[in-house]
């Protein structure tokens, strides 16, 4: 690979501090240990008000349009969403409603989510995966879900979560024809 991968990570939470942001940053950091990347982090909370006020892409301020273009031009997307009342936030869906229908075809997407308990873990497979299937993106088979119990003071403390983050990054690396560390083996 002659250039670093353009990795765009979208943290779909609107509040700070944010476990979703911490998880997104951990995924980016782990991925950077396996692949040469150029990362761009988008925090939904930072663009929430102007994004929410736009009913069409033509109404977006230039800085928000630039963020959508970054998503559309990514070599790899990381999309992490908090789970509220059984689903990802509506504003996150609104953002993807403004993405060009063909822009994400064959783009690998690493899915992640955070929620209050394990009962929301299926949001990865039952809500986020179908969203990106619509765009004909390639959702990676390993998603990462974290609960409040996996964090202390907005730091990841759970060893199983750390292992899942490592596994997700290691499984993503071969898609780009290179990997720097041997893959984890699951018994």
Curated annotation (Swiss-Prot):
Its EC number is 1.5.1.42. Gene3D superfamilies: 3.40.50.360. InterPro entries: Flavoprotein-like_sf, FMN_Rdtase-like_dom, FMN_Rdtase_MsuE-like, NAD(P)H-dep_FMN_reductase. It catalyses: FMNH2 + NAD(+) = FMN + NADH + 2 H(+). One of its GO terms (molecular function) is FMN reductase (NADH) activity. Pfam families: FMN_red (PF03358). It comes from the Bacteria. Keywords: Flavoprotein, FMN, NAD, Oxidoreductase. Involved in the dimethyl sulfide degradation pathway. Catalyzes the NADH-dependent reduction of FMN. Belongs to the SsuE family. PANTHER family: FMN REDUCTASE (NADPH). This is NADH-dependent FMN reductase SfnF.
